[in-house]
Amino acid sequence: AGAAAQLITYYVATISNGPSGTAPVLARAGINADGTFDAQPAPVAVGAVGRQALFGVDCASNATAATGGITNYRTWSQVVSAQIAGRVRSVLYAVVTRTLQTDARNPVVNAVPIPSPNLGTGDPTFTPFYPRTTDEQRDRYTVHVAEVALRNQIWGN
């Protein structure tokens, strides 16, 4: 018998921060094929307030021959609607984190821009993160962006 199928998902949640309230956290959960949790969701990184992903594809349409490289970036809904899931070569993701202590001396932040790739005309971009409260506008923010190549897709060309 083989191992059961499982989906690992990451999401932004809040956890209790004792008497000071709550703190944002990047959480991880394993979901079994039958829809049950493998274990309780676990916090991975405190301070995470946003995450986004774009998918590097080899041509934005099946009408064009594959090149063996990444020619465009797409959102997942664009990948699905164009039926090019087999052409996804990488996942480019961004995680926005913030400090846990607000300081009135910090400059007011109305938006946190996230650098986006620009390979082809019409490529989507990451959406800036917008602080939701006055206190959040006085936090300091960091954007972490990384790209992960999908090995089987690259070598299976």
PLM regions and their residue ranges:
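Short, surface-exposed charged micro-motifs
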Residues: 9-11
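Extracellular protease catalytic domains of secreted zymogens
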Residues: 28
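Short linear sequence signals and composition-biased patches located at protein termini or domain-edge surfaces
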Residues: 2-5, 14-20, 32-157
